[in-house]
């Protein structure tokens, strides 16, 4: 397939994100493939797959907010913060009232805070991924990251399990959030299920399973950027844009995509001053 754009897949449990996109690459005979945000093997849900020139749009989808459905199991901790890991601590269950759970959830609802990523993650330190250090039992300093829990709501609390829906900023680790929530409840916990239901404006009901995915599921680059709420300016003459020169356009936003009249994305531009824009990312069509 020579076309470019994105495909929204619903990742099944047990696959790595890379394994998923490689399966898609083989199935559709794609030359170049990528994704805009990894999911843990245990997790399911929305993965934005970038096809051919669509890989050049990675940053513009990575920066979007996310939404998840998550279930946490109380009184049991694992090294990976989820049920794929080894149990490292267990507590005798004790009574936690639903009112307590609701109070803690309310505390995190709308909260911006410095979150510590889990050691079992793909963050790189000195060129090496954190999970590689963890597997070698090496202790490294991990910088906390400012994240925001835009919305957190309780869906169900029973049998020592708490199910919630989370809307959060990019870079949020749900596994770490669950550990932080457990601390506020004076206990330990780990994730037993995690489902990404939204990535930016791309939602799970519009996703497709890898088994049913076809070329017709491709969303063209122009349409994908429009769906992501970026501003697109169509020009009759795109010669200056193709050469990466500054241009003058009237636009509402500071970041705009430039296309020709055939709705082919050419480049991404950012406002320099007034109506003058400079090239931020060119060659989107080549």
Swiss-Prot record:
Active-site residues, record numbering mapped to chain: 40
GO molecular function, one term: tRNA pseudouridine(55) synthase activity
Keyword check for Methyltransferase: no
Single biological process term from Gene Ontology: tRNA pseudouridine synthesis
Coiled-coil region list: none
Domain of life assignment: Bacteria
UniProt-listed Enzyme Commission number(s): 5.4.99.25
Entries under Pfam families matching the protein: TruB_N
Catalysed conversion reaction: uridine(55) in tRNA = pseudouridine(55) in tRNA
Record keywords: Isomerase, tRNA processing
InterPro entries, per database record: PsdUridine_synth_cat_dom_sf (IPR020103), PsdUridine_synth_N (IPR002501), tRNA_psdUridine_synth_TruB (IPR014780)
Cited PANTHER family: PSEUDOURIDYLATE SYNTHASE TRUB1, TRNA-PSEUDOURIDINE SYNTHASE
Function: Responsible for synthesis of pseudouridine from uracil-55 in the psi GC loop of transfer RNAs.
Annotated NCBIfam families: TruB (TIGR00431)
Family the entry assigns: Belongs to the pseudouridine synthase TruB family. Type 1 subfamily.
Name of the protein this chain belongs to: tRNA pseudouridine synthase B
Organism: Mesoplasma florum (strain ATCC 33453 / NBRC 100688 / NCTC 11704 / L1)
Gene name as annotated: truB
């Amino acid at each position: 397939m020579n076309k470019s754009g994105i495909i929204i897949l619903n990742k099944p449990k047990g696959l790595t994100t890379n394994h998923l996109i490689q399966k898609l690459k083989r199935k559709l005979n794609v030359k170049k493939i990528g994704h805009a945000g990894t999911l843990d093997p245990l997790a399911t849900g929305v993965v934005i797959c970038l096809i051919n020139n669509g890989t050049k749009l990675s940053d513009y989808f990575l920066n979007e907010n996310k939404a998840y459905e998550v279930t946490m199991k109380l009184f049991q901790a694992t090294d990976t913060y989820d049920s794929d890991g080894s149990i490292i601590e267990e507590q005798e269950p004790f009574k936690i009232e639903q009112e307590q759970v609701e109070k803690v959830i309310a505390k995190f609802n709308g909260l911006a805070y410095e979150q510590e990523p889990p050691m079992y993650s793909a963050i790189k330190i000195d060129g090496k991924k954190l999970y590689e250090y963890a597997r070698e039992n090496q202790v490294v300093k991990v910088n906390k990251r400012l994240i925001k829990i835009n919305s957190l709501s309780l869906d169900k609390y029973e049998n020592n399990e708490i199910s919630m829906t989370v809307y959060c900023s990019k870079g949020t680790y749900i596994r770490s959030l669950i550990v932080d929530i457990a601390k506020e409840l004076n206990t330990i916990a780990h994730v037993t299920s995690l489902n990404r239901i939204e990535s930016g404006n791309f939602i799970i009901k519009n996703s497709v399973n890898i088994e049913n995915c076809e070329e017709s599921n491709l969303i063209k680059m122009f349409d994908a950027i429009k769906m992501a709420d970026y501003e697109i300016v169509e020009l009759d003459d795109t010669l200056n844009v193709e050469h990466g020169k500054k241009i003058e356009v009237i636009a509402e936003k500071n970041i705009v995509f430039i296309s020709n009249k055939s709705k082919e994305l050419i480049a991404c531009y950012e406002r320099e001053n007034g109506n003058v824009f400079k090239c931020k990312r060119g060659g989107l069509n080549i």
